[in-house]
């Protein structure tokens, strides 16, 4: 994965790091929920999502997010439509991984990555590993 990492640093943002090799989904969801002001842990979300040693399904993450009172939906999305706090599913080689969009411009994508912390990736490289599968988590409309 180091091939496409331009920089890595932990900033002031809340980034929940994954505690197990297969818990990137719950950690990514915990990052988004905490940034939305929802108190949660990676372990709690992993249990709610049915995470096991093979990982977490997007459906499991939707169940976990809704159980915390938020709206969540899995969608297919184009790169240009990605926004802050979108949880994206990426694939490089045989590795599948959930990570969180922090910001994006015409050249770079900055991620809150549960395995690596805050990283910046060249947009061209990110476009090759981005699958188009996105989990959008939002507060319910009042």
Curated annotation (Swiss-Prot):
GO terms (BP aspect): proteolysis
Hydrolase among keywords: yes
Keyword list, A-Z: Hydrolase, Protease, Thiol protease
Keyword Hydrolase tagged: yes
Domain Peptidase C39: 18-137
The protein's name: Uncharacterized protein MTH_1463
Domain of life: Archaea
Gene3D superfamilies per record: Cysteine proteinases (3.90.70.10)
Disulfide bonds: none
CDD domains membership: Peptidase_C39G
């Amino acid at each position: 994965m180091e091939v496409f990492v331009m920089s890595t640093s932990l900033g002031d943002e809340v980034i929940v790091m994954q505690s197990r090799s297969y818990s990137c989904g719950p950690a990514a969801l915990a990052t988004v929920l905490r940034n939305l002001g929802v108190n949660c842990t990676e372990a709690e979300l992993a249990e709610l999502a049915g995470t096991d040693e093979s990982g977490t399904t997007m459906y499991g993450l939707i169940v976990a997010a809704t159980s915390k009172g938020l709206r969540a939906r899995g969608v297919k999305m184009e790169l240009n439509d990605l926004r802050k706090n979108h949880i994206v599913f990426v694939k490089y080689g045989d590795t599948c991984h959930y990570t969180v969009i922090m910001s994006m411009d015409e050249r770079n994508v900055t991620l809150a990555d549960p395995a690596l912390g805050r990283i910046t990736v060249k947009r061209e490289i990110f476009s090759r590993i981005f699958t188009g599968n996105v989990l959008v988590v939002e507060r319910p409309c009042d």
